Amino acid sequence: MTPIKQSICWGVVAAAGEPADVVKQVKDIGYASIEMSPPEIFPIIKDAGLDIAIFVGHKSLADGLNKRENHERIYDELMASFELAEQYQVPSLLCLSGNRYEGVSDLQGAEICAEILSRVAPVAEEKGINLCMELLNSRVNHPGYMCDSTEWGVHVCKMVNSPRVALLYDIYHMQIMEGDLIRTIQNNIQWIKHFHTAGNPGR
């Protein structure tokens, strides 16, 4: 079994002080990586000898992959993010489905997400970088978010059928939406490349 490498989200610690001091504290605690930080923090993280596990590859959580009118923008943003990921040896980029909107069913939204991910997948495969679509809850924190169930996310991944397109499985969010976490993870582990962990309730 591959050892677990613990990473911490930048937003959890960012307010604790100056970036260099915060990064040092994270390293002293024993974390291997910092993730979800803004790119201007990347050099500080790497200079401290830490990894960057993942960062957000494109703009806008609510206005995401599930709208075709966003695809050109997101494609360009992901291409720029691939360059950053290569520069700083980041193995994964985070992607976001976007929120539900009138006139598009969840099935149609999945197909639209698969279209743009299929377009980007060959680049991800060539560069050896994962595209991880995050599962978020739509009941508490992100009302309307479309990728709010493991089944839906896996359906998108199966349509794309790329070894570099997978899910970011967020344990906090999926406990709110589904529960039965261990069984769900075991049954779908081939479609999961990254995990986020937090307790529920209370996070």
Where are these regions (language model features)?
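N-terminal pre-domain/capping segments
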Residues: 1-87, 158, 162, 178, ...
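Short, flexible active-site loop motifs that bind/organize anionic cofactors or intermediates
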Residues: 12, 64, 103, 143, ...
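Conserved beta-strand positions
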Residues: 31, 36, 95, 133, ...
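Active-site acidic/histidine proton-transfer and metal-coordination neighborhood
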Residues: 40, 67-166, 176
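A short, flexible beta-alpha/helix-coil linker loop
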Residues: 59-62, 99-102, 137-139, 200-203
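Histidine-bearing beta->alpha loop at or near hydrolase active sites
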Residues: 172-173, 202
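Bacterial c-di-GMP phosphodiesterase catalytic domain signature
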Residues: 179-186, 190
